[in-house]
């Protein structure tokens, strides 16, 4: 590779930003083009009555990913990002103010589970933590932080002498089934089954391998000063310091090729920009649907388009909740968890009694700072192309369902006027090709991880990253996908 080689990154989500850092460190001339006026993709904020409120991901985990990334250009994460560990991972609510806190300390959580359910469930929790750590350790460097494998290459990476450990990742069993082997109390099965939604999936269909998410959270959840968008800002700042340029508020209409090889992009303004390599940081289906031009419409020899992952309906705004003992992360459950996913994935309907997530962004130190506080409220929803409801009244319908769940949990929470509501249709328009899914394809079935697209394509010079690409959705995983894409570029260019 020569110093003059130019890389264009389409999209400034976590993956695109991570790739920009890696590529500038390797000496590439990097230009990041983003349709929005801010970086971060789904890591975003809105302003309501002069308050900045997170609208997207709110959980910061896998700190090691970002420490390593920032160190690529000689930066220390602690110097660039103000963050603090959270002693309470989440507070969970059921009927009539029944609550359970999960703590960063396993012993505290086990004691809480023993009082909430039984000593047998507390013992089951300890086994669950040990097994989820084992799964995580087996797959961290062989799958998550490595290029997309096939089943055989994964066995080689793990090692034939550790085939037993690979079998214990439980990809052949569903998360919902395996949780019943640890917990007798159905509420605990519900609580830990929710980890499937972190990858946009149903616990009834996703492999039990996703237990590893429990260990990811147990290893640390941090609160970021300034919200998750401060992470995106820090990534942009680091990339810019090494020479990456950013063109915000500009859309790419097409990726161009010459003699079968990528040679640049055309912007919505009609400007042709030359490039030696192009990285697409967006939903892979945008390529498949021809939204970036016919010449790159078939990025893979075999095209897989499985079931879409979950979408969401969100409200970002101010709430009145002085009498509600909220934590920073709160989950409000209804009694029939499987019905939620059957309605979403099989009927394309909103759940009658949805699980409600409330991120009370002013509660990190306990207590309520004022009569009004910032919050993100979220429920799961079907993607646009599977939805069987009327988009015109879906927000009001969903709000009534949320209020019913809040009341049933015995909480006094009022969403004030002036909030910003986003629906599957909004997400579909903001992230082309996604159909409103926030996670790419659903992780349903034992082969889902191998069907997810890799960073390389069959078109020379074209790469991809993001939540719809290996290793999967979520800010840390999308960040890893960007790094993997950059490493693939560097390796292929020599």
Where are these regions (language model features)?
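Rossmann-like flavin
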Residues: 95-205
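C-terminal segments that line or cap access tunnels to active or ligand-binding sites in enzymes
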Residues: 320-428
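Mid-domain catalytic core of redox enzymes
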Residues: 223, 253-369
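Helical element adjacent to the flavin cofactor pocket in flavoenzyme catalytic cores
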Residues: 212-262
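Active-site-proximal substrate-binding core of FAD-dependent oxidoreductases
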Residues: 257, 490-494
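A conserved FAD-binding loop/helix module that cradles the flavin
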Residues: 57, 467-489
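N-terminal glycine-rich phosphate/pyrophosphate-binding loop and immediately adjacent elements
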Residues: 3-138
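A glycine-rich dinucleotide-binding beta-alpha-beta segment and adjacent secondary-structure elements
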Residues: 185-199, 353-357, 411-471
């Amino acid at each position: 590779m020569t110093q003059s080689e130019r890389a264009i990154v389409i999209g400034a989500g976590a993956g695109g930003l991570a790739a920009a850092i890696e590529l500038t460190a390797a000496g590439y001339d990097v230009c990041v083009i983003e349709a929005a006026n801010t970086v971060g993709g789904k890591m975003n904020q809105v302003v309501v009555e002069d308050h900045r409120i997170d609208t997207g991901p709110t959980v910061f985990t896998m700190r090691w990913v970002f420490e390593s990334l920032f160190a690529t250009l000689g930066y220390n994460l602690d110097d660039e990002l103000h963050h603090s560990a959270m002693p309470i991972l989440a507070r969970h609510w059921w009927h009539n103010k029944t609550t359970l806190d999960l703590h960063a300390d396993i012993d505290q959580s086990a004691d809480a589970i023993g009082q909430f359910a039984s000593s047998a469930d507390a013992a089951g929790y300890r086994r669950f933590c040990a097994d989820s750590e084992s799964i995580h350790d087996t797959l961290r460097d062989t799958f998550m932080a490595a290029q997309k494998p096939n089943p055989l290459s994964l066995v080689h990476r793990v090692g034939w002498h550790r085939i037993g450990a690979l079998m214990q990742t439980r990809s052949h069993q569903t998360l919902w089934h395996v949780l019943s082997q640890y917990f007798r109390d159905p509420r605990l099965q519900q609580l830990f089954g929710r980890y499937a939604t972190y990858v946009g999936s149903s616990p009834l269909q996703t492999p039990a391998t996703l237990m590893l998410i429990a260990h990811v959270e147990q290893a640390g959840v941090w609160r970021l000063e300034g919200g998750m968008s401060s992470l995106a800002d820090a990534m942009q700042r680091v990339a810019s310091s090494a020479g990456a340029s950013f063109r915000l508020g500009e859309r790419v209409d097409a990726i161009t090729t010459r003699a079968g090889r990528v040679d640049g992009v055309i912007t919505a303004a009609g400007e042709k920009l030359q490039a030696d390599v192009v990285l697409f940081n967006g939903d892979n289906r945008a390529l498949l649907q021809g939204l970036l031009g016919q010449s790159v419409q078939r990025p893979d020899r075999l095209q897989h388009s499985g079931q879409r992952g979950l979408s969401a309906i969100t409200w970002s705004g101010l709430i009145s909740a002085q009498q509600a003992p909220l934590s920073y992360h709160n989950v409000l459950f209804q009694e029939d968890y499987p019905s939620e996913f059957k309605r979403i994935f099989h009927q394309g309907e909103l759940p009658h009694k949805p699980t409600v997530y409330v991120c009370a962004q002013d509660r990190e130190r306990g207590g309520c700072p004022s009569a009004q506080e910032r919050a993100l409220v979220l429920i799961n929803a079907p993607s646009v192309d599977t939805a069987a409801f009327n988009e015109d009244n879906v927000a009001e319908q969903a709000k009534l369902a949320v209020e019913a769940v809040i009341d049933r949990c015995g909480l006094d929470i009022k969403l004030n006027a002036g909030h910003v509501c986003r629906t599957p249709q909004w997400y579909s328009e903001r992230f082309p090709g996604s159909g409103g899914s926030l996670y790419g394809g659903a992780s349903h079935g034992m082969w889902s991880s191998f069907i997810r697209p890799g960073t390389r394509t069959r078109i020379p010079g074209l790469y991809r990253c993001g939540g719809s690409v290996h290793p999967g959705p979520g800010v840390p995983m999308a960040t890893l996908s960007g790094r993997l894409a950059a490493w693939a570029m560097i390796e292929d260019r020599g």
